[in-house]
């Protein structure tokens, strides 16, 4: 774990230009429906003020998941510095059955020890459900906080935490030599940096399953092209630059293939490239437009958008052959799906009655639940644990990023201050 904390994102920081973060999570609704939990400010054992509010990071992570409602600090019945100091009755009286406490200690070599304990207030005093400690340098303190959040979240829900993940997105600003930027940040908007700047539009970033590369669309050559960029060194590999449209890249879960849409023969159709050999094969054909592929977990089947029935709907096709099967039936049109990592559901843009929102469809039953309530919602991307969706929506004359939990109860915004933000893509586990 300590080794992971030191190197997990080192390859990114080596070359990337780090920016002052422009994106922060702003809670809109739903936090009150989460499970109450206590997160105490971590005890600082050094001089002056603590270099980072680790307890605040943990509380924010748990709140952002939509599954927890951390008690406001002003209402904490006590501020224990260790598990032994937790008084169960004081917390149980507030309906809280779990409390996170922690300590941050400076080391002579300039590093820090970060420790936490998850305390069960329903058991004997000092009963610890989970605990860990990490030795990190100052720049990794936030990462240590996210690590603690992941472990607490998994212990209490049985679901792997996704707080150490990242998001990629495109920012468009007005004026300047490079008005389009592909950026990456922590899932909560911190530690933002630029992957690529361009005078021409950038679109549709997609993560490789190991998190080391991004595929995206660029127009820098005068027409659309698909490229894959390695984050560690910035190396760019051009994948496709055929006449007309090249777009909608999607890595297969096993990392061996890239699906995308081309219109080199007229209509948009799906193609799959074997990344080792570079060989491309066509998956769909016909006069309809077929685009926006997303993989099922088996790396053999795709969900995609097609207008073969008139309006856009989501279909499923095996890349080895066979006729596509329509899988969306509710609403006037459905498109731009993202299938969950377990293959049990997908999120998509669903339009009905003049409204365009993010919806979730159970792939076994076909049941659909509308998740969002913002305006002109598009490009949904699932967190790797399937608990949250990031998407873009229109606000005023521009576009912003939004979060919604996949149960629809929790909603938040990630407002940007320096431009329109589009095409969000949630990373795999890192």
UniProtKB/Swiss-Prot annotation:
Q: Where is the signal peptide?
A: 1-21
The record's NCBIfam families line, in alphabetical order, gives: propeller_TolB (TIGR02800)
Listed InterPro entries: 6-blade_b-propeller_TolB-like, PD40, Tol-Pal_TolB, TolB_N
One GO term describing the cellular component: protein-containing complex
Q: What is this protein called?
A: Tol-Pal system protein TolB
Compartments it resides in:
Periplasm
Q: What is the similarity comment for this entry?
A: Belongs to the TolB family.
Taxonomic lineage of this organism?
Answer: Bacteria, Pseudomonadati, Pseudomonadota, Gammaproteobacteria, Enterobacterales
The annotated region (TolA box) lies at 22-34
Phenotype when inactivated?
Mutants lacking the tol-pal cluster suffer delayed outer membrane invagination and contain large outer membrane blebs at constriction sites and cell poles. Tol-pal mutants fail to complete division and form cell chains, and fail to process denuded peptidoglycans at the septum.
Question: Which source organism?
Answer: Escherichia coli (strain K12)
The free-text domain remark for this protein reads: Effector proteins that bind to TolB can both negatively (Pal) and positively (colicin E9) regulate association of the distal N-terminal TolA box with TolA by influencing the conformational equilibrium experienced by these residues.
Quaternary form? The Tol-Pal system is composed of five core proteins: the inner membrane proteins TolA, TolQ and TolR, the periplasmic protein TolB and the outer membrane protein Pal. They form a network linking the inner and outer membranes and the peptidoglycan layer. TolB forms homodimers. Interacts with the peptidoglycan-associated lipoprotein Pal and with the C-terminal region of TolA. Interacts with the trimeric porins OmpF, OmpC, PhoE and LamB. Can form a complex with Pal, Lpp and OmpA. Interacts with colicin E9.
Sorted keywords for this record are:
Cell cycle, Cell division, Periplasm, Signal
A matching Pfam family = TolB_N
| MF annotations from Gene Ontology | protein domain specific binding; protein-containing complex binding
- The organism's superkingdom is given as Bacteria
Name the SUPFAM superfamilies on file: TolB, N-terminal domain, Tricorn protease N-terminal domain
Described function: Part of the Tol-Pal system, which plays a role in outer membrane invagination during cell division and is important for maintaining outer membrane integrity. TolB occupies a key intermediary position in the Tol-Pal system because it communicates directly with both membrane-embedded components, Pal in the outer membrane and TolA in the inner membrane. The Tol-Pal system is also required for polar localization of chemoreceptors clusters. The system also appears to be required for the activity of several outer membrane-localized enzymes with cell wall remodeling activity.
PANTHER family on file: PROTEIN TOLB, PROTEIN TOLB HOMOLOG
| A biological process from GO | cellular response to bacteriocin
């Amino acid at each position: 774990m300590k080794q992971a904390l030191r190197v997990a994102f080192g390859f990114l920081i080596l070359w990337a230009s780090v920016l002052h973060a422009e994106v922060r999570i702003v809670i809109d609704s739903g936090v009150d429906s989460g499970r109450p939990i206590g997160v105490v400010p971590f005890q600082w054992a050094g001089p002056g003020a603590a270099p980072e509010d680790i307890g605040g990071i943990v509380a924010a992570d748990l709140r952002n998941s939509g599954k927890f409602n951390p008690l406001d600090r002003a209402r904490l019945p006590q501020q224990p510095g260790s598990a032994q100091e937790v008084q169960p009755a004081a917390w149980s009286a507030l309906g809280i059955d779990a409390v996170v406490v922690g300590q941050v200690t400076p080391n002579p070599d300039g590093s820090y020890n970060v420790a936490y304990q998850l305390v069960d207030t329903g058991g004997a005093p000092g009963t610890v459900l989970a605990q860990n400690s990490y030795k990190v340098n100052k720049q990794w303190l936030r990462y240590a906080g996210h690590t603690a959040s992941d472990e607490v979240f998994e212990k209490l829900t049985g679901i792997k935490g996704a707080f150490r993940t990242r998001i990629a997105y495109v920012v468009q600003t007005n004026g300047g030599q490079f008005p389009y930027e592909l950026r990456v940040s922590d899932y909560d908007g911190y530690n933002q940096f630029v992957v690529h700047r361009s005078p021409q539009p950038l679109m549709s970033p997609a993560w490789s399953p190991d998190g080391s590369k991004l595929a995206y669309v660029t127009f820098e050559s005068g027409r659309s092209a698909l490229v894959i960029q390695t984050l560690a060194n910035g190396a760019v590999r051009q994948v496709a630059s055929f006449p007309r449209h090249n777009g909608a890249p999607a890595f297969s879960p096993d990392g061996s293939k890239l699906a995308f849409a081309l219109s080199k023969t007229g209509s948009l159709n799906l193609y799959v490239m074997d990344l080792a050999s570079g060989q491309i094969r066509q998956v769909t054909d016909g006069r309809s437009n077929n685009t926006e592929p997303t993989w099922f977990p088996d790396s053999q089947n795709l969900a995609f958008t097609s207008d073969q029935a008139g309006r856009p709907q989501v279909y499923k096709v095996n890349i080895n052959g066979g006729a596509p099967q329509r899988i969306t039936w509710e609403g006037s049109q459905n498109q731009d799906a993202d299938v969950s990592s377990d293959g049990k559901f997908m999120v998509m843009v669903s339009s009905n009655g003049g409204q365009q929102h993010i919806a979730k469809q159970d792939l076994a039953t076909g049941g659909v639940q509308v998740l969002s309530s913002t305006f002109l919602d598009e490009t949904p991307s699932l967190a790797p644990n399937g608990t949250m969706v990031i998407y873009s929506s229109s606000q005023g004359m521009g576009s912003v990023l939004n979060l919604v939990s996949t149960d629809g109860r929790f909603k938040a915004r990630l407002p940007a201050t320096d431009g329109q933000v589009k095409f969000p893509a949630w990373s795999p586990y890192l």
